[in-house]
Amino acid sequence: MRVILIVPIGYIPEWLIKDVAEFVDSYYSRRGVSVKAGDSLSESLFLSAYHPFRRQFLGGAFLPTLSEIGRRAGALATVGITKVDLYEKGMNFVFGVASEKLRSAVVSIHRLRPEFYGRPSNDELLIERTVKEVMHELGHVFGLSHCPNVRCVMHFSNSVDDTDIKLPYYCPNCERKLLRNLEVVL
């Protein structure tokens, strides 16, 4: 069975990685792909991606390193989870970034945490949001684009409210495309 690696970058609570990996595995294992947690990476590997004026990291700069880790492990895809704030050129922030070519993605929990918005900490909500963003970025890794269905996990999240509205699953149209694309890579 092929593997998706979920790799913590910096300190990410073990329970978060475990719960996210279990959910993603519950979906992808039925499609011939298992999910496992990889060894933690130091944030210092990505210091060159830091933009001091913005106080954010360029998300795409994480992908080559994650891709190489996945390649060495024989993984089908690799997803990093970090607590640092991410951006991409032309955007104020991103929850995550993915590359189909590199078969890698990174998701930031920075803006997924309720505390970022002045709310009390809520581990269940953080897990739910992180699951949705990991499923979304994996969709991109496997060739899906954004979906107009606001309940589909592939819908673009312009804010955390958009993330909260959508479900952690692919809509029937995206599911069909994903299964077709997985047949090619498996």
From Swiss-Prot:
Belongs to the peptidase M54 family. It comes from Thermococcus kodakarensis (strain ATCC BAA-918 / JCM 12380 / KOD1) (Pyrococcus kodakaraensis (strain KOD1)). GO terms for biological process: proteolysis. One of its GO terms (molecular function) is metallopeptidase activity. Binds 2 Zn(2+) ions per subunit. One is catalytic, whereas the other seems to have a structural role. The keyword Nucleus does not apply. Zn(2+) 2 binds at residues 147, 152, 171, 174. It comes from the Archaea. This is Archaemetzincin. It holds the Pfam family Peptidase_M54. Zn(2+) 1 binds at residues 136, 140, 146. The active site is at 137 (proton acceptor). PANTHER family: ARCHAEMETZINCIN, ARCHAEMETZINCIN-2. It is an enzyme of class 3 (hydrolase). InterPro entries: MetalloPept_cat_dom_sf, Pept_M54_archaemetzincn, Pept_M54_archaemetzncn_arc/bac.
